[in-house]
């Protein structure tokens, strides 16, 4: 994920990403002030930072689905957990 600045949007913790995912499920695209609500749910990020993070996520998904990047090859170790 390329960025022109080294703001807090450049680095997201695993916890922040999980909070981000949950907030996206809670606040859909029709929610008024969606990005402010998502930012509040994540904590420590601005509405602009969460909006940008979402745009990068969508771009990554589109790139994967278009075949630009191969799907990861997860090997099974024999345990189906």
Curated annotation (Swiss-Prot):
Residue span, SANT domain: 7-62
Alphabetically ordered keywords of this record: Nucleus, Transcription, Transcription regulation
The UniProt record lists the keyword Disulfide bond: no
Localization per Swiss-Prot or TrEMBL: Nucleus
Lipid biosynthesis is among the record's keywords: no
Gene3D superfamilies per the UniProt record, alphabetical: Homeodomain-like
Tissues and organs where the protein is expressed, per its UniProt entry: Expressed just outside the vascular bundles in the rosette stem and the leaf traces. Not detected in floral primordia.
GO cellular component, one term: nucleus
Single GO MF descriptor: DNA-binding transcription factor activity
PROSITE patterns: SANT
InterPro entries xref list: Homeodomain-like_sf, RADIALIS-like, SANT/Myb, SANT_dom
Signal peptide: none
Further remarks about this protein from its record: Assigned as a member of the MYB-related gene family, I-box-binding-like subfamily.
Function of the molecule: Probable transcription factor.
PANTHER family xrefs: MYB FAMILY TRANSCRIPTION FACTOR-RELATED (PTHR43952), PROTEIN RADIALIS-LIKE 3 (PTHR43952:SF17)
Name of the molecule in the record: Protein RADIALIS-like 3
Organism: Arabidopsis thaliana
Designated gene of the protein: RL3
């Amino acid at each position: 994920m390329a960025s022109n600045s080294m703001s807090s949007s450049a680095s997201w913790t695993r916890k922040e990403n999980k909070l981000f995912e949950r907030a996206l499920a809670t606040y859909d695209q029709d929610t008024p002030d969606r990005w402010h609500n998502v930012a509040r749910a994540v904590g420590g990020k601005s509405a602009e930072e969460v909006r940008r993070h979402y745009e990068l996520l969508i771009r990554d998904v589109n790139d994967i689905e278009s075949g630009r990047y191969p799907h990861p090859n997860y090997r099974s170790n024999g345990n189906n957990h």
